[in-house]
Amino acid sequence: ACPFAAKWRKDGKLRIEVRSDKSKYEKHLTSLLKDWNKKKHDIIIFCDPYYDQYSLEQFQEKIDFYNKTYNRRDVYFMGFHPDNPASVEEQEFLVEPTDDTTYDNPIPYSMMLIQKFKQLYEASCKLHKIGYYKKWPPEYYEEVVATRQKTYEKLFKKGVTS
């Protein structure tokens, strides 16, 4: 639950797309990327109800491939797969970050979040300063946030480390 998400949605900066058929996943995603107006939308969420066509491992390979290909173009990819849901025990801060009633989606789907890398880096720096990540398990923080921040710094801030 990103604290910036509600503002992006309210400001119309969030684009949500759903894979409409079972044709090749990469074809849909690449088409979205080519069509992305970065001045209009800060983030794209690509939902895929046909996620059963690929395993969790294959999905992670897609994320890694797109990051390797697009990070240098100031684009970062994150994904969520129904076969690896956030659990209360491991990631309570993600499952119920505000203690609100959790909405249970009857139609499972994978989700690829595509965002401007610089914007994500800067937002993450702000969140770090206000203590947002303090409740995160250290291993999860390292895997998700610290690694991403180091990648950005390596690509765009030569000689700077977090």
Language-model segments: what does each one mean?
Residues 1-162:
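Expand to "…catalyze enediolate/carbanion chemistry for C-C bond making/breaking, isomerization
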